[in-house]
Amino acid sequence: MIEADRLIQPQVIEPDEVVDRAMRPKLLDEYTGQDDTRAQLKIFIEAAQKRGEALDHMLIYGPPGLGKTTLAMIVANEMGVNIKSTSGPVLEKAGDLAALLTNLEENDVLFIDEIHRLSPVVEEILYPAMEDYQLDIMIGEGPAARSIKLDLPPFTLVGATTQAGSLTSPLRARFGIPLRLEFYNIKDLSTIVIRSAKVMELEIDEEGAIEIARRSRGTPRIANRLLRRVRDFAEVKHSGAVTKVVAELALDMLDVDAEGFDYMDRKLLLAIIDKFMGGPVGLDNLAAAIGEERETIEDVLEPFLIQQGFVQRTPRGRIATQRAYNHFNLIQPEAK
């Protein structure tokens, strides 16, 4: 299992949660990156406001740490409504969902993180709520049980998931606005780093921000986490200001290399190169070779490596690319 304190893991690390909340943008104009998504949202929100209606139900999907929760909160702020947040695993019974739905006010936002992990019984309750703003619930047990319908105010369900393919077709079809978040480019990430540094009252120059962004795996959550660790280094070892040199020294010490890789990324790449002669290697064999679960490889390690061109996924298995060999100053063997 990957250690919970892996510095560049995109999932939330508990001690960082409060600080991350303070750094989050509140409105679309403050939100950096995801230009197409922002442009679409502006139109959808303005149209809903002109009609005086709830925004259509929205599914936000993509790798972890890219701002799905932040976008849900921005939608509520832009619409001028309340937001209630929960997650799929928490909603164990139909009554858990019913309690949330019956406390919504008109046009409110209900945010369900990890919506792909909803139980089937809860998902069934959600269908009429999304389509007709009605709640069908069973009262009582056994022969005396009866179904009652409750009218709900119009509301917007915002679902977030890292595994859109795991959603059932009926649930996925009920979202009128699907939004995919992509990894951020270095320019946008450096802008986020500079904004976060201002919130932290930290002096940072542009080159320092770019260096942190370059090693942040295209992920704002990782960029903010690295910024906090670089700040610690700058305050103890230097004058307190973050420059390119300070950022390089700090991140090298933290074992985050120039590509944003840590030991787990290098372990995976070297396993493909050394143990499987560059591949192809099946997912189960690769998982066994590095001592990780296949889900961890698919959901946490692989997406960035594939997106950056270090690993190629083929029908026969994973292959290390020329770029992976170059990263370790190795010569790629001739194709088999």
UniProtKB/Swiss-Prot annotation:
Sorted alphabetically, which keywords does the UniProt record give?
Answer: ATP-binding, Cytoplasm, DNA damage, DNA recombination, DNA repair, DNA-binding, Hydrolase, Nucleotide-binding
Q: Which gene encodes it?
A: ruvB
* E.C. no: 3.6.4.-
**Statement: the UniProt record of this protein carries the keyword Ribosomal protein:** no
What is the UniProt domain comment for this protein?
Has 3 domains, the large (RuvB-L) and small ATPase (RuvB-S) domains and the C-terminal head (RuvB-H) domain. The head domain binds DNA, while the ATPase domains jointly bind ATP, ADP or are empty depending on the state of the subunit in the translocation cycle. During a single DNA translocation step the structure of each domain remains the same, but their relative positions change.
Q: Which GO terms describe its biological process?
A: DNA recombination; DNA repair
Q: Which residues bind Mg(2+)?
A: 69
Family recorded in the similarity comment? Belongs to the RuvB family.
Name the enzyme group at the top EC level. Answer: hydrolase
Task: Give me the reactions it catalyses.
Answer: ATP + H2O = ADP + phosphate + H(+)
User: What PANTHER family would the database entry show?
Assistant: HOLLIDAY JUNCTION BRANCH MIGRATION COMPLEX SUBUNIT RUVB, PTHR42848
Q: Tell me which HAMAP family the record gives.
A: DNA_HJ_migration_RuvB
| Region listing for Head domain (RuvB-H), in residue ranges | 258-336
Q: Which domain of life is it from?
A: Bacteria
Q: Where is this region: Large ATPase domain (RuvB-L)?
A: 4-184
In UniProt terms, what function does this protein have? The RuvA-RuvB-RuvC complex processes Holliday junction (HJ) DNA during genetic recombination and DNA repair, while the RuvA-RuvB complex plays an important role in the rescue of blocked DNA replication forks via replication fork reversal (RFR). RuvA specifically binds to HJ cruciform DNA, conferring on it an open structure. The RuvB hexamer acts as an ATP-dependent pump, pulling dsDNA into and through the RuvAB complex. RuvB forms 2 homohexamers on either side of HJ DNA bound by 1 or 2 RuvA tetramers; 4 subunits per hexamer contact DNA at a time.
Q: Which residues bind ATP?
A: 24, 65, 68-70, 131-133, 174, 184, 221
Task: Please identify the protein, giving its name as recorded.
Answer: Holliday junction branch migration complex subunit RuvB
- Indicate where this protein resides in the cell: Cytoplasm
Q: Which GO terms describe its molecular function?
A: ATP binding; ATP hydrolysis activity; four-way junction DNA binding; four-way junction helicase activity
Subunit text: Homohexamer. Forms an RuvA(8)-RuvB(12)-Holliday junction (HJ) complex. HJ DNA is sandwiched between 2 RuvA tetramers; dsDNA enters through RuvA and exits via RuvB. An RuvB hexamer assembles on each DNA strand where it exits the tetramer. Each RuvB hexamer is contacted by two RuvA subunits (via domain III) on 2 adjacent RuvB subunits; this complex drives branch migration. In the full resolvosome a probable DNA-RuvA(4)-RuvB(12)-RuvC(2) complex forms which resolves the HJ.
Instruction: Return the NCBIfam families for the record.
Output: PRK00080.1 (NF000868), ruvB (TIGR00635)
